[in-house]
Structure formats: C-alpha cells, structure tokens
C-alpha cells in the first residue's frame, strides 16, 4: 500500500498487458505528499487505475470475506489482474464478527478449465514460447487494442460471480448496489467504508420522510455504465459523488469524473434527463467520517446552488471549500451497546479491549465490532 504499491506500477503494466491473472489485496492508504503519512484513504489505488488492473472495492470486513473470492475467480476466468482494495485501518484493522464462506462451496465455483489454461501458460521446455518481445510502431498499436475484448467481458463475469456468491451467503452483491428510498431524489455515490455511515444516515433521513439513497461502488474498474444505470432510481434529481483522494489540478476527483462521464455517454438515463452532479472529498488520512458529516452532504444537495468540489470533515479557512457540519449524532440501532475507551501508550487498554471483544464474539451470539485509533 501507499508508496510501496506505487513501486509496483511498472510491473503492473506488464502483468496486465500480458493478461496474467493475479490479485493484489490492498488496504488502501495515503500516499505521502507534503508530510509523511501512513493512514488510510484511496490515494494509492487511484494512482494505479490506469495500469490495466481491474479494481474491486469492499466497505466492511464481511464484504472483504465475501468479495475477495470474486476477484480471484474473475481474474482467472477473464485473464485480467485485479486490485481488491478496502480502506486501510478503518476496515483492515477492524475487529468484526463475520460469517465465513464454506471452503468447499468456493472450491466448487473454481473454473477448472481456466485454471488448467493458466497453468499451461507457464514456461516449459516441452512447449517453448517467446515472451517479453519488443514491438515496433507498425504493430504495437494494433496488439495493444486487442486486449479490449477481455476488459469488455469483465463486468459481466464479475456480476455473474457475485450472483453465485450471493446465493451461497444470502447477502446480495452486484457491481453497483443501491440502498435507500426506491423513489429517491437525492443520492450519494461512494465506495469503501464510508458507505456504511451513509446507509445509517439514509435510514435516519428516510424516517423523517426524506427521499434519499446511496449507491455503493464495488466494481470500479472496468467502470460499467450499464450496471450503474440498472440500480439508479428513475426519480433521482441530484447526485453527490464522494472521493477519498485528492487529485490537484484536475476538474474533479476520479470517481466524480467517472460518474459524470457515465451520465454524459449513457444511451438512455433511467431518470429521463441529466441530473445535477456534484463532487466532494472526505476522509483523507483516516480522518473520521461521521453521520453528521453525511447529513451536511445531503443538506448541501438541497441548496439552490450546491457547493461543488467541496470538502467535509475539516474547516477549510484558506480556500473555503468545506461544508458546515452540525452537532454529532448517534445512529446506533436500538439494543446496541456502545463504549469509548481512552488509554495511554503501552498501558494495556488496546490489548484488553481486543481480548474482550474476541471473547464476547466467540462465546455469545452477539454481533461485535471494535476499532482502535492510535
């Protein structure tokens, strides 16, 4: 992750260019810029989006369990390498009680013919081949474009594999997943752990009569416009796209630009006409993203002239792009017990809490979740 992942970029171009199926599991982290930083956002994976790797994203620990096999199975079948990423620290270091997928069920999903074909590509003196060739201008362009059909096939392969995983787990997965009011007028598009916070905020606002929703992006590359439009409510009027990275000098951050392009080039829109689309940035360097901040995002969408390319979660008193955020609220469901522990370095607070949550999760039928900020 972080600068370490960026060191792999030259190799990633070759891996993808030679159609070698592999999976990089990445706990997405900040790429150090003006200061050293080890915490979580999408800076590193966004720097790899042009390499030719397909990109799959999860928002919580259970999704990592369920969708990681999708990356492996689709890579093997489609001959396209994958980055399977989730938020560094917020997801990668969280303790959560999850349901495991039966290994026999996963083994049954394996495409044996694709596996055999992959192994047959190994270098072997019994059937010698030439690799690592150099190509001149007369042929390079054509052979580079020949990979198009492989990438065009990936979204359907991923969708089919997700459908099979959904049958096994009972949890529904698609390249894009919609959550919220079926007649929503204002929606957020995002990926990663923030979608869990947005879902709770959507429930809160719907209980107050507001027509809102969220689209979770699982398959980021290739960006499949067809699957995005399939889940888009026909009633939508305004969309906010949230990015967890900063691309200085660009007209917008990556996910925002992808969504805008998707609407601009779609053959038909479920909503009939082009909705207003704005973008915002949140959570750089593991900055906590709270329900109050997501309420601010929805409030911004209501304005006659919503702020575009905003930030949320900080006070920007230099370029004044930040949204005002109200008082923090708790959206825990009834029956939930929450606790916040404070400790000093090496005083045992973290270890004691880790042991406690594991004991509770392992010896009771209660759902447990724990996270630690250092």
Language model regions located:
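Anionic-ligand anchoring segments at beta-strand to alpha-helix junctions in alpha/beta enzyme folds, i.e.
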Residues: 168, 182, 189-218, 335-374
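Short acidic, glycine/serine/threonine-rich loops at helix termini
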Residues: 7-12, 33-39, 66-69, 93-100, ...
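N-terminal alpha/beta PP-like core and its mobile active-site loop of ThDP/TPP-dependent enzymes
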Residues: 3-56, 84-85, 105-107
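Glycine-/acidic-rich phosphate or pyrophosphate-binding loops and their flanking alpha/beta elements
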Residues: 163-186, 322-336
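Conformationally flexible catalytic loops at phosphate/diphosphate-handling active centers
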Residues: 82-177
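Peripheral docking tails and interdomain loops at the edges
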Residues: 238-332
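Conserved thiamine diphosphate
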Residues: 38-88, 112, 261-264, 268-283
């Amino acid at each position: 992750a972080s600068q370490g992942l960026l060191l792999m970029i030259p190799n990633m171009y070759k891996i993808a260019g030679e159609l070698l199926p592999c999976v990089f599991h990445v706990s997405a982290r900040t790429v150090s810029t003006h200061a050293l930083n080890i915490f979580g956002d999408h800076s590193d994976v966004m720097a790899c989006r042009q390499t030719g790797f397909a990109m799959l994203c999860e928002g919580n620990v259970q999704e990592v369990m369920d969708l990681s096999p999708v990356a492996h199975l689709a890579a093997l079948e489609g001959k396209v390498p994958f980055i399977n990423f989730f938020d560094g620290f917020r997801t990668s270091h969280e303790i959560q009680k999850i349901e495991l997928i039966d290994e026999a069920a996963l083994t049954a999903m394996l495409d044996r013919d694709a596996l055999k074909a992959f192994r047959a590509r190994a270098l072997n003196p019994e059937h010698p081949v030439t690799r690592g060739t150099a190509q001149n201008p007369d042929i390079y362009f054509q052979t580079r474009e020949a990979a198009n059909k492989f990438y065009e096939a990936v979204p359907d392969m991923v969708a089919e594999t997700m459908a099979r995983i959904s049958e096994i787990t009972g949890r529904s997965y698609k390249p894009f997943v919609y959550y919220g009011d079926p007649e929503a007028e204002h929606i957020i598009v995002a990926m990663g752990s923030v979608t869990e916070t947005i879902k709770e905020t959507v429930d809160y606002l719907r209980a107050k009569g507001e027509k809102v929703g969220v689209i979770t992006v699982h398959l980021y590359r290739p960006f499949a416009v067809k699957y995005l439009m399939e889940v888009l409510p026909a009633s939508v009027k305004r969309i906010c796209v949230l990015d967890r990275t900063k691309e200085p000098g660009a007209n917008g951050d990556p996910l925002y630009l992808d969504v805008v392009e998707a609407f601009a080039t779609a053959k038909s829109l479920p909503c009939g006409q082009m909705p207003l689309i704005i973008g915002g940035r949140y959570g750089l360097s593991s900055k906590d993203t709270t329900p109050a901040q997501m309420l601010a995002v929805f409030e911004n969408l209501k304005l006659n002239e919503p702020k575009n390319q905003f930030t949320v979660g900080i006070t920007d008193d230099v370029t004044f792009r930040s949204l005002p955020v109200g008082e923090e609220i708790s959206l825990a469901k009834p029956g939930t017990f929450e606790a916040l522990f404070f400790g000093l370095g090496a005083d045992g607070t973290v270890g004691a809490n880790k042991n406690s949550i594991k004991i509770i999760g392992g010896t009771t039928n209660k759902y447990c979740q724990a996270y630690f900020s250092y």
